[in-house]
């Protein structure tokens, strides 16, 4: 396909994993904007960390992207929160303008700087957003809204920086915008044919378990409580 312009990177963010809010927990959700080019390899941005490698990071979740377009909606829906005053509220590595979950499809390949990225999955929000925002149901709000952000795997390492263009270079599954995937998984009634079609794609392991498990249970939805709410002693 002919490469097409999608948007622009507004900020590149990274940060260390530190002790978080609950006993034994760690998080790198609080990130700082980088100046100048940042190297990116198969595991993400150099200088960035993840607090819980069981559910964050790795090749399928190497880079987290969140649309700055969503910030006004959150500012309108929530009480004034300083965390929303600048990019990085959701622990994203890339903040951008011009592209949201409606504009990107599963498997899309995008070029940012010299880095080639592939959309691997949408974010599945967890309880750490509740604690970061001081809003008890923030993770549920993010999931229900579809304003989740998304992850990339890195196909070609390189460097990127704020101001870089976001260019679409391949779209193998135009029928699967991320917004549709999230609606199928979290909003719409069970449709075996639609989930079967989704299962035919090369999904990440976590999404494959989710989709195939739901099909095997005849549409019974998995319990999201631990992920969305955590426990007082969440590790």
Say what each PLM segment does:
Residues 1-131, 137, 170-235:
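Electropositive, beta-rich accessory/interaction domains or terminal extensions
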Residues 96-98, 149-156:
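Short alpha-helix capping/helix-loop boundary micro-motifs
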Residues 101, 152, 161:
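Short, flexible micro-motifs
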Residues 107, 157, 162-164:
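Loop/turn positions that initiate beta-strands
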Residues 136-153:
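A mid-sequence, solvent-exposed acidic-amphipathic segment
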Residues 147-148, 164-166:
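A structural signal for small-residue-enriched, beta-sheet-centric alpha/beta enzyme cores
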């Amino acid at each position: 396909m002919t490469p097409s312009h999608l948007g622009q990177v507004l900020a590149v963010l990274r940060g260390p994993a530190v002790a978080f809010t609950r006993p034994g927990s760690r998080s790198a959700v609080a990130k700082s904007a980088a100046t100048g080019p940042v190297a990116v390899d198969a595991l993400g941005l150099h200088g960035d960390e993840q607090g819980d490698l069981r559910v964050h990071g790795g090749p399928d979740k190497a880079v987290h992207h969140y649309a700055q377009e969503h910030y006004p909606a959150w500012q309108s829906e929530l009480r004034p929160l300083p965390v929303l005053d600048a990019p990085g509220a959701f622990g994203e590595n890339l903040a951008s303008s011009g592209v949201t979950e409606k504009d990107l499809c599963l498997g899309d390949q995008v070029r940012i700087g010299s880095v080639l990225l592939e959309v691997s999955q949408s974010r599945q929000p967890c309880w750490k957003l509740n604690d970061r925002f001081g809003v008890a149901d923030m993770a549920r709000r993010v999931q229900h809204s579809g304003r989740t952000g998304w992850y990339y795997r890195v196909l070609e390492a390189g460097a990127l920086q704020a101001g870089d263009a976001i260019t679409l270079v391949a779209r193998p599954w135009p029928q699967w915008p991320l917004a549709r995937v999230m609606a199928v998984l979290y909003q719409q009634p069970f449709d075996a044919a639609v989930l079967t079609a989704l299962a035919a794609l090369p999904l990440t392991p976590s999404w494959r378990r989710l989709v195939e498990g739901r099909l095997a249970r005849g549409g019974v939805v998995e319990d999201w409580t631990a992920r969305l709410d955590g426990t007082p002693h969440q590790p």
